Amino acid sequence: GHFHNPELLGVRKIIRKTHFHNLDLIPSNLRLYNLEYEIAGHMARNQNMEIIDLIAQAIDEVVDDYDVVIMDPPPALGMVSMAVLQAANSMVIPVPPSLVDFASTVSFIDMTRTTMKQLEQLAGRGRPAYNFIRLVGSRVDESKSMHREILSMMRQVFGGSMTQSVMVTS
């Protein structure tokens, strides 16, 4: 199908310039939202996992035009997120300093590990080799003692994978 050809996907056509110098983006849209269902449908019909490489193929088409390509998939392990995980060479996972978000992130990492192993078995492929995986505190208000305590706990649990720098609440 047309999913395997990034030219037909038209990745160059959907890249938009921003008012920031040398920062382009592909805005989320209904077509990307529908991609979740299209990928699942394609996999069910064709009984193969090649479609999971769709995003990697699209990025390969334009990767030489950029220093860094940042992908921001939904925080769920759907087909689009799996395709992003396959296409990525590094990960930065934002974690707000709340117990619910911390627990959610631990669960997400465990589910991702399991899902990637299943994908490896189903597709007969190796897991992606990431240059790095880092967790970063996000929406942090360092004047709140609870935020400081939870960040400290996250650093103990995640060790060197947790950045010292945080993204503060703005």
Walk through the language-model features, giving the residues of each:
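P-loop NTP-binding core
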Residues: 1-170
